[in-house]
Amino acid sequence: MSLLRIRKASLYGFSTVFILLQSYAVAYPLRAFRQNDGIGIAMNPSQDGGFVSAEKDSDFEYWMKLIISAVLILLGGVFAGLTIGLMGCDDLHLQVLEQSGDASERVHARKVLKLLRRGKHWVLVTLLLGNVIVNETLPIVFDSIIGGGWPAVLISTAMIVIFGEVIPQATCVRYGLSIGAKLEPIVLFMMYLLWPIAYPTALILDACLGESQSTMYKKSGLKTLVTLHRDLGIDKLNQDEVTIITAVLDLREKHAESIMTPIEDVFTLPMDRILDEDLIGEIICAGYSRIPVHKPGFPHDFIGMLLTKTLIGYDPDDKWPVGKFALATLPQTWPNTSCLDLLNYCQEGKSHMILISNSPGEPHGAIGVITLEDIIEELIGEEIIDETDVYIDVHKGLPRVGENNDFWNRMLHRSHLSTMAALHKSQRSHDLAANEHAPILNPKNSALNPRLVTNDRVKVKSPSLIQSSTGYGSMSQSPSRSDLPSKISRVNAELQAHGSQRSSIDVSKENKSSVADGPSSQAHNGPSTQPPEALPNGTDPSSSKTTENNGNQQSERTESADGKKDNSGSISSNSSKTFTGKRVRLGNVIESNVVSPDGTNRIVIEPFERSVDPNNADIVEMVERNGIVVPKVTVTSHEDDVDSVHNTPMSVSSTLSVKTSSSKVPRNKRKRRKGKSKK
C-alpha cells in the first residue's frame, strides 16, 4: 500500500511540474524571444533544396528543455529524500528488522544494510553531490526556458522547494526504508559514478569524525523504552511484563545487602538446642524450610543450616540436639555481592540460602541471610507468598491476610495494623478504634502441630496405643524390617551384575580397537608400565585406570540422562542419571573452602575481583568443559603439583582425577599414530 501511494505521488508530482512549466513557458518565453530578436519567422535551407521553418527547431528545443527541467527537479527530490531517509536509518534498528521483522522488512533492511556498510559517509557525500549538481544545473535550464526576471526566480524557487525538498523529504521520513531499498541500484550507480570525488571526501570524513556509531541504550534508557511500550506501539506490553523486564535489568546492580533479611529477624537455632515437642511446634509454626544453626553462645557464628524435611521421620521423644543432625552447608558472602551472581550460584544446586557477613569465613560478622526466593522476588519485581508464609514482608513486618480479604490486602501498609495482633484472633468490635476494622480472615499457618492444636483431620495415637499395636512406629515391629536384608542383597547383586556387564563391554571395545589398529598398537592396550612421574599429576597407573573408569561411567550417565541407550542396548536405570546442564556465569564468583582453627569448614562466595591470591588451592575459578562446570586447573607432571592435588578439597580433587583420565586418552592416540607410522 505504501509503495502504491509513493508511485501515485511521484506521478502526480511529475505531471504537476510539467504542466506548470508548460503553462508559464507558453505564455512568456517564445513571445519574449521573438520580441527581443525583432525577427520574424526565419527559414533555414533543407537538404532537398527547400526551406524549414526555424520555429519548428525552437519548439523542439523548448520541449526538450522543459522535459529536462522536470527530470532535474525530480532527481533533486530523489537525492534530497534519500539523504534524510538513508542517513536516518540506524544500523541497530536495521539489524533488528533484518532478524525479527516481517518478510518485506527483512528484504529491505538487508539491502539498505549492504549499501550502508560500504561506507555511510560515502553514501552521504554521493547524495549531497548529486543534489548540488542538480540544483546548480536547474537554473541554467530554466533561464533558457522562462527567461530572466523575478518570475523566473519565483517559479524556480517554488519548484525546487516544493517538489525538490519538502515533498520528497516528508515522504522519505516515513517510508525511508522501503524507498531506499527500491532505489538502492540508483544510489550504487551514483556512488561509482562520482567515486573520484565522493570516495576521497568520505575517507577524510572517516579520519576526522570516525565511523558512525549505532544507537546503543543504557539500562536506564532501556527501562524507559520498555515503559513507553506499555502505552505506545502496536504490540503493547502489560504492567506485569514491564515490571519483570525492568526488575531483570536492575538485578545485577542490586547488592545482597539491599534485599537480605536482617539477622535479628531470622529464625535461628543453637546446635545444642534439644529438638523436643515444643521446638518442633515452633519450627512448624514458623513455616521455614531452612533454619540457620550457630554455635552455643555465639549467635553470629553459623556452622550450617537445618533442613526441616529431615525431621519428617524424627521422633521428638528421642530429644536429639540440633547438632546431631546432618546439617547442610550454609555459604557465606560479602554484602556487596551482586544478586545476579548469587542467582547463578544457587542454580548450581549447592544451596538456596546464603549468609551475608562482613567477614566471610570468620566466626563473626553475620548481618543477614538471603534465599533464592528473595532473589526471584527481585527478579520478577513482586512478592511470592506460599501456603505457609506468615509474613508478606519481614522487613516491614507485614503479616499475611487471607486471599479473600481484598480490603485488608490493600490496607496492610496502615500503621495501626499491629503485626502480633494479626497473628491472634480478631478483636471484638467494641475493642477497635474508630479508624480500625476487624480483618475477615486471620493470617494463620495451616501446618500446626496436631499434638498441640486440635485438628479433626489428623488423628494422633497415644503412646500406650502405639505400644499395644503391632507394625506401627517401631522398626523392629514393622513388617518391612524383615525384607530389608533381602532388598539390600538384591540391590547389591544388580549393581555387581551391571558393573561386570559394563567391564565386559569395555574389554570387547578394547579388543576391537586393538584388532583394527594392528599388532604395533596392541602393546599400548595392555597394562601401563610407565612410572608414576610419566602420568599427569604424578598419579600411579592404578589410580589413573580407576579415574578413567569413573570418567567412562560419568559419560554413560550423561547419555542416560539424555534418554539415550547405553552400550548394552538397554535403557539405564534412573539411579544412573545425573544433571550436566549447569548454567553459570563463568568467572563472576569464586567458591573457596575456609577451615577455621577449630576445624569448622565454611564455604565463602566472593566476586572474582576479590581473589587476592589466585594461586591458592582453595580458590579455584570455575570453567565449563563438555557442559559440566569444573575448576580451572592446569594438568602438569611435576612432583610439586602432587601435593596441591592432595591438599585440594574433595570436589576439586575428584574433578582433577577426571581431568587426568580425560587427558590420558589423547596421549594413547598419539602413541597409536606413531606406531602406525613406524609400521
UniProtKB/Swiss-Prot annotation:
TM stretches of this protein: 66-86, 122-142, 144-164, 185-205
Domain of life (superkingdom): Eukaryota
InterPro entries attached to this UniProt entry: ACDP, CBS_dom_sf, CNNM, Ion_transp-like_CBS
Signal sequence annotation: 1-27
Record domain CNNM transmembrane: where: 58-241
Recorded GO CC terms: cytoplasm; Golgi apparatus; membrane
UniProt-recorded Gene Ontology molecular function terms: magnesium ion transmembrane transporter activity; transmembrane transporter activity
Topology Cytoplasmic: residue spans: 87-121, 165-184
The protein's name in its UniProt record: Uncharacterized protein C4B3.03c
Organism encoding this protein: Schizosaccharomyces pombe (strain 972 / ATCC 24843)
